[in-house]
């Protein structure tokens, strides 16, 4: 299962839509800022499941602040990350939250810095910003039948 993960688009959707169209992903994730940009994904790819959460710049109650989903048997925590102080470079509270929820994968955003790490048995993936700055990026996460997880940060 391939999952295209975007975050922090801040109204800039063209590159995100192009990448999503080229990937042939099985699911799409938008991790907030701006949550309404997820609507663009939904309209462009109505056949794909879309998972969304809101970020610190989002006010719409349509998207939850966080979400726990199962991708091919792998439990994942989806959140923007701002409530876990990820912008201070600390990921321990995010790892703890994932462990408490029985998740082995966390998809988060907020920092505008891509991250792909494993801490305490939890894979942490931040796709970076899809909408701001010169280093725009997204993540492609692959879930294998044996429960393995691979993640790759790709430029936009």
Give the role of each language-model region.
Residues 2-8, 75-81, 123-128, 151-153:
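Active-site-proximal beta-strand elements of phosphoester/diester hydrolases
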Residues 2-71:
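Core catalytic region of metal-dependent phosphoesterases/phosphodiesterases
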Residues 10-14, 35-39, 57-62, 84-88, ...:
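Active-site environment of divalent metal-dependent phosphoester hydrolases
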Residues 29, 51-53, 77, 107, ...:
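Hydrophobic/aromatic beta-strand patches that form the interior of the parallel beta-sheet core
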